[in-house]
Amino acid sequence: MQRSVQKLIVWLGAIFVAYHIFSLLFAGRASRNGYSKGISLQSPAKLKGDPQRAAAIVEAFRFSWDKYEQFAAPHDTLLPISKTYEDDRNGWGATAVDGLSTAIIMEDAEIVDKILRQIMLTDFTVTVVPDQPISLFETTIRYLGGLLSAYDLLSGSYKHLATDMYLRNNLLKAAIILADRLSIAFDTPSGIPDDEIIFNPQLRRFGNIDNSITCFGTLVLEWTRLSDLTGNQTYAKLAQRAQDHLIHPKTKQSFTLPGLIGTYVKLKDGYFGDYQAGWGGGSDSYYEYLIKMYAYDPVAFAEYGESWIKAAESSMLYLASSPSTRPDLTFLGEMRGNTMIPISSHLASVCGGSLILGGLLLQNQTFVDFGVKLSESYYDVYRQSPSGIGPELFRWVDDGRQPLAKASSKRLPAPKWQSFYEKSGYYHTNAEYILRPETIESLYYAYRATGDRKYQDWAWEAFEALNRMCKVEGGYTGLKSVMKTKDDKTRKFVDKMESFWLAETLKYLYLMFAEDSELQVRSDGKMKYVLNTEAHPLLVRGK
């Protein structure tokens, strides 16, 4: 009986996506805000930069760095309201390491030199706080990715900034030292790593019983790159063995969707727990890395590309949903069992960029068009917000076209937000903003795919909102609620300048307005670099 129901749902979903894609690509349904329809891939001719806007982004980066240097260096994270710091990322100077590749791309030789010298003085074998759990995921994407990216850039396109070869070579040395210590995380019965490790006083795993697909499915790019740079295949083998559990998932659940695997996996045997799937926290960057590994080496990682295609197609079939009050918008919901819940997040807005990137690599127009549609819809969340910035989490009521959105998942907004929902098509469930990049990131991919300068204008709108709402005397800070304007005297801040503000948000803004270069995404899919989930460019294998 369950199989029959599942087949029926899949069949209904196929009808839905056929209608949805047809209306998106061909029907020309009237839309607000000038949304694109039937977008054509641009030739790989150079796209125009905007020097004045690019300079403004550089100024924001330097302001952020100056405040970090003044109040927080060499510690991890600046607290811009209280003008102090915290060591929330192991005490190794997360903001500096994470911001290094951006400083290199902006060709700020002074900041690059300062960070290289700070890294030289950093001991990556101990944490500042004893018994502090280290996140394998966060340490890989921020530190390992940052070190390897800087090494790649300073060894190639930006070698003129590497005035001291000893400092440059120390980047790879530090990455090796760090990865060797982190490797204990993979010492589990299944080879799926524990996401938490203790470095000191004794090196050991923390002892978690499961891990999310984001936390261990977003390691393979950095660990494979480290193997390619060193010739030591141990690092790649560890990460790829873990990844195999996701490429060939094991589950006891009666209902799953093709390509959209669950979220949590047992370290003991590699089996998935309850079926939860989507592009939100816990899942997002696993899907992102499938297509990025294909970009890194389309032959060696062809199976990763095939897995991404399945996930992308299922996302279009079973997760795509339009709000009841804004049928012109399309978001991706989350699966809970056999029901699609119409909820999404700032993290999930990366889905548009991933579909565009996959479409460019595969030269598949349908993926590009759907990715652009998602990117535009998620940016509309920004435009409708009183602050001009999108919230951490939001929800909507499905318009009835998604078969997996059952009546039980329908939840109306609170009365005070009903009029806002009528206009915007969403209502927030967590109104915070912590300087995240994903919506701007997807606009960047939309611009690189289409050459349409409206995406530059939208990114500039977002930057103006960030300057207006988040810039304070001590740096850039998060917001407790994007539903409050600058003039609202009750507005409050999240007192933290996350390292990804320098690594990702400002980098994507800069790349949006920078002149064409070999770092930029190309519409023909022939890229020299692939950006990790922290926006650190890594040299594609064989380039």
Question: What kind of region is each of these model predictions?
Answer:
Residues 2-543:
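Glycan-recognition and catalytic cores of secretory/periplasmic carbohydrate-active enzymes
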